[in-house]
UniProtKB/Swiss-Prot annotation:
Gene: ESV1
Entry's Gene Ontology molecular function annotations: starch binding
Entry GO CC: chloroplast stroma; starch grain
Name listed for the protein in its UniProt record: Protein EARLY STARVATION 1, chloroplastic
Any single GO BP term: starch granule initiation
Organelle targeting sequence: 1-19
Region (Disordered): 65-126, 403-431
Phylogenetic lineage: Eukaryota, Viridiplantae, Streptophyta, Embryophyta, Tracheophyta
Similarity-based family: Belongs to the ESV1 family.
Localisation: Plastid, Chloroplast stroma
Length: 431
């Protein structure tokens, strides 16, 4: 859908199994692997047979609801052919729009603003500043108009001021068809104050004549931690889309946090539904900047008939010593449960203790000679996020008068991390 002199034109909205992507494949977040032991050969990760069942391996899960969960020994697959596919590509977003397309629509007294109303892309992580193309005006604007086909549009901008040097520059635009069935909205903003806080953000939403709706919010923040005095940059994104033709939709929440000493935290919560099938995924990464790393993934799915299945794993390492563990499980509509658990203990001396068992009687417990590999540092860290946040860093706060100092509330903590509760489908902002 685009707002122009000819009006609003809706674009297709595809949430069918054919239009969805493949699930459950984990996000290929590893771009570089660092060896933390004596080995000097080209790093590569080795997994035990049990670890191979963890969600690090790209595979297709299939469930046959007619078969009992406690299947034959070693069974690791079941099938559900209607399950939509959900790829997990790199967190670096691959959006189709370009920055230069946005600037003309915020020119005062220019043509009607052009809508960027396509639904957000799934599993594209957090977009960059350049992909959003936020361009705020230095003057207040309030305009509206009607196109030849009866569709309407509006555009406005402003500059709000507050206590403690608070400043918020913003721009808002949108439009709708003559009958109101098609609509789009978009807002940009930048915030700052005398404490050094800076924020750049955007939010957009839309709906079409078929009843499909979508919403997306993006934000990046720079602030100084009151207790450590370290600079921090945090980026986040929330995305949602719903189908108007069937019981289908998805929701994602992504976040990344960095500080100047290498502390890094990343994670995502995801939820999707296609008619009688639902699926969830949560994953997280934590680096303390001194060598400790924690990573985990938890994925599960279910059908309205009662079939459920999932896979989860976790790894912790420091100075070449650590552990990995995980579980794959399945519950049939009748309540029969099958599971396989596995674990690894890495001692840092070339010895690895591997163990595991399953509800079908499998078990193993042995010590093997094996090198230990893991990522001790994030592939995208503080230096990278600073280099990609030039627009955020260039935000100019209101000039502080001599002798006036910012008020800092030490009782307030840094923004709370996202809840561990499974994400659901929040209501559309357009409803």
């Amino acid at each position: 859908m685009a707002a122009c002199s000819r009006g609003l034109v809706a674009r297709p909205f595809d949430l069918t199994a054919r239009g969805a992507a493949h699930w459950p494949c984990p996000a290929p977040r590893r771009r570089a692997i660092r060896c933390c032991c004596r080995a000097q050969q080209e790093p590569r990760r080795r997994l035990s047979k049990a670890a191979a069942a963890a969600p690090e391996r790209t595979e297709e899960w299939r469930i046959d609801g007619n078969k009992p969960a406690a299947a034959a020994r070693g069974r690791r697959r079941a099938s559900l052919t209607a399950m939509p596919s959900l790829p997990f590509p790199s967190p670096r977003s691959r959006r189709q729009w370009k920055q230069q397309n946005f600037y003309p629509r915020c020119t005062p007294r220019g043509p009607a603003p052009q809508s960027r109303d396509t639904p957000p892309k799934r599993d594209t992580g957090i977009a960059s500043e350049k992909e959003w193309g936020i361009n705020l005006l230095d003057e207040a604007v309030k305009e509206s108009g009607t196109n030849e086909d009866g569709s309407t549009w509006y555009r406005e901008s402003g500059d709000d001021r507050g206590d403690n040097g608070y400043r918020c520059r913003w721009a808002r635009m949108g439009g709708q068809s003559h009958d109101g069935t098609t609509e789009w909205k978009e807002t940009w903003w930048e915030k700052s104050d005398w404490t050094g806080y800076k924020e750049l953000g955007a939010e957009k939403s839309g709906k079409n004549g078929a009843g499909d709706s979508w919403w997306e919010k993006w934000k990046e923040v720079l602030y100084q931690d009151e207790w450590s005095n370290l600079a921090r940059i945090e980026r986040s994104a929330e995305k949602q889309a719903k189908s108007g033709a069937e019981n289908a939709g998805w929701y994602e929440k992504w976040w990344e946090k960095y500080d100047a000493k290498g502390w890094t935290e990343k994670g995502a919560h995801k939820y999707g539904r296609l008619n009688e099938q639902s699926w969830w995924e949560r994953w997280g990464e934590h680096y303390d900047g001194r060598g400790f790393v924690l990573k985990w993934t938890d994925k599960w799915a279910e059908t309205d008939l009662g079939t459920k299945w999932g896979d989860k794993w976790e790894e912790k390492f420091f100075a070449g010593i650590g552990s990995r563990q995980g579980e794959t499980w399945h519950v049939s509509p009748g309540g029969d449960r099958w599971s396989r658990t596995w674990g690894e203990e890495h001692f840092g001396n070339g010895k690895v203790h591997k163990y595991g068992k399953s509800t079908t009687g499998e078990s193993w417990d042995l010590v093997v000679d094996e090198e230990t590999y893991y990522e001790a540092e994030p592939h995208y860290g503080w230096a990278d996020v600073v280099g990609d946040s030039t627009q955020l860093l260039s935000i100019q706060p209101v000039e502080r008068p001599p002798g006036v100092y910012p008020t800092i509330d030490f009782s307030a903590s840094s923004p709370a991390p996202p809840s561990d509760d499974p994400p659901g489908m929040p209501p559309s902002p357009l409803e």
